[in-house]
Regions:
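Substrate-binding pocket helix/loop in short-chain dehydrogenase/reductase
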Residues: 42-43, 50-55
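A short, exposed helix-loop element centered on a Lys and neighboring polar residues
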Residues: 66-67, 112
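The beta1-alpha1 cofactor-binding region of Rossmann-like NAD(H)/NADP(H)-dependent oxidoreductases
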Residues: 8-19, 48
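Active-site loop of short-chain dehydrogenase/reductase
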Residues: 2, 27-28, 42, 73-86, ...
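Conserved NAD(P)H cofactor-binding loop of Rossmann-fold oxidoreductase domains
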Residues: 34-40
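C-terminal helical subdomain
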Residues: 120-132, 143-189
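Catalytic loop of short-chain dehydrogenase/reductase
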Residues: 81-106, 111-112, 116-120, 134
Length: 189
């Protein structure tokens, strides 16, 4: 009974983020922050720009997006749902992924702080841990041998991820979930 629109924008640009929410209008009741730059790199070989960019995309962009979503939800006085896409990196460090691990962990902490700060305003903030490779074009085109080795059962289905987001969106305020993990039955965790 509603409509949704996926928008690609520079999450690290404050003006672009404000324009995004201005364009969304007063009927906004769901906003999903889904960015990431899961690129490996050894910390001692990493330049500062690489590390800072991971933080800008994952955490700073999440701050800008979350702030504008909550401002809009509060201004319309009907609340809303703000969801952040996390990863297993949100919960634990992994060798050769220090930039990504730390920035996704920071995003999770930001989401948790926002959940506690704005629940009283009717804003449901959630964090979805996507734990494993996603069965989408990015992995199928970029790493075809890896995708073939995993098989469809070894990658998280996009429909399954969407189901998780919809589950959180539909929750009543008397039973809000903050964090939901999505993974295949084959994922070792």
């Amino acid at each position: 009974g509603g409509s949704a629109e996926a928008v690609v924008a520079d999450a690290t640009d404050e003006v672009a983020t404000k324009e995004l929410f201005a364009r969304a209008g007063d009927n906004l009741d769901l906003a999903i922050y889904n960015t990431g730059n899961n690129t490996p790199g050894r910390i001692i070989d990493m330049d500062a720009d690489f590390f800072a960019n991971s933080w800008r995309v994952c955490c700073f962009g999440g701050f800008l997006f979350g702030r504008e979503a909550v401002r809009q939800f509060i201004a319309t006085q009907h609340g809303g749902t703000l969801l952040f896409t996390g990863a297993s990196a949100s919960l634990r460090g992994r060798a050769n992924f220090g930039a990504f691990n730390s920035s996704k962990g920071a995003l999770r902490n930001l989401a948790q702080a926002m959940a506690k700060e704005y629940a009283q305003d009717g804003v449901h903030v959630g964090h979805v841990v996507v734990d494993g490779p996603i069965a989408g074009e990015k992995i199928k085109r970029g790493l075809p041998e890896y995708a073939e080795r995993l098989g469809e059962d070894g990658m998280i289905s996009i429909d399954g991820i969407v189901d998780g987001f919809v589950y959180l969106y539909r929750q009543p305020p008397q039973a809000w979930t903050f964090e939901l993990d999505v993974r295949t039955s084959k994922e070792k965790w």
